[in-house]
Amino acid sequence: MEPLLTFSGVELYYDQVYALRNVSLEVNEGETVALIGANGAGKTSILRAITGLRKIRSGQIRFRGQRIDGRPPDELVKMGIAMVPEGRRSFPLMSVKDNLLMGAFTRHDKAEVARTLEAVLARFPRLRERYGQAAGTMSGGEQQMLVIGRALMSRPTLLLLDEPSLGIAPKLVQDIARSIVAINRDEKVSVLLVEQNSRIALKISARAYALSTGAVALSGRSAELLNDERVKKLYLGGEL
C-alpha cells in the first residue's frame, strides 16, 4: 500500500542557509510518526514544507499519491491535512465555540459540522465547560486542547502537531499525549508529531525520525529507538 505522505529528497533553504538536506520520510495510513531532534534540527521546517508555508527547492512531497508541494494551505485542508502550530495560536478574544468553528471553514454541511463539534467536545470535556469563555483566558494546556480540537473540526486524514507539550504543566502534558494516542486509535487519523520532548514522542508513536542539522540522522521503530544508546545520548539526556 502506498504511504499516505511521502517526502522524497526534499531540500529547503531560508535565504541561502539550508534548513532541510535531502530529507526522505513516510507516514502510513493510521500511523503516528514522531520527528525528534534539537532546536534548529529541521523538524518544524518539515511541517512548513508540507503545509506550503515554505517553498521547497528540490524533491517532492506527495499526499495520497498527489504532489502537494506548492499548493496553497486552504487546498491542503480540503485534501485532509490539518496543522496544529507551535505556540497554541488560538484567537484569544473569541469564545471556545467560535475558535472551534473556525476549524470547519472549508465545510458546508451544518449537520455534519455539528456532529463533529459534539465529538470534539466529548473528547475534550474541559472545552465544553469553557464553551462560551474567551480562549485567551484559559490555561496553556486548555488552549492546546482547543487548537487540537479546532484542527479536528476539518475532519483531517493527517494531523500535523508542532511541539504540543511546549510550555504546558507536566500533568496536562500527559493528558495531551493520551489525547493524541486516542485520536490516532479511535478516529484513525494519521499523526506526524514534532516534539522536543523526545521521550514522550517515542512512547506514543509507532515510528520516528531523528533529525540533526536538517538531515535524517536515525530512523526506525520508536520502541527500538527508545533503547538505542545513540538516541539516549543525543536526544534523551542519558539513561531512561
Give residue ranges: language-model regions.
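Helix-to-loop junction immediately C-terminal to a conserved catalytic motif
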Residues: 51
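The feature captures the beta-strand-to-loop junction immediately N-terminal to the Walker
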Residues: 36-38
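Helical segment within the ABC ATPase nucleotide-binding domain
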Residues: 174-188
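Conserved catalytic motifs of ABC-family nucleotide-binding domains
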Residues: 155
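ABC ATPase C-loop
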Residues: 151-152
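Conserved ABC transporter NBD signature motif
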Residues: 59-68, 79, 112-117
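ABC-type ATPase nucleotide-binding domains, specifically the catalytic core motifs of the NBD
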Residues: 15, 33, 55, 71, ...
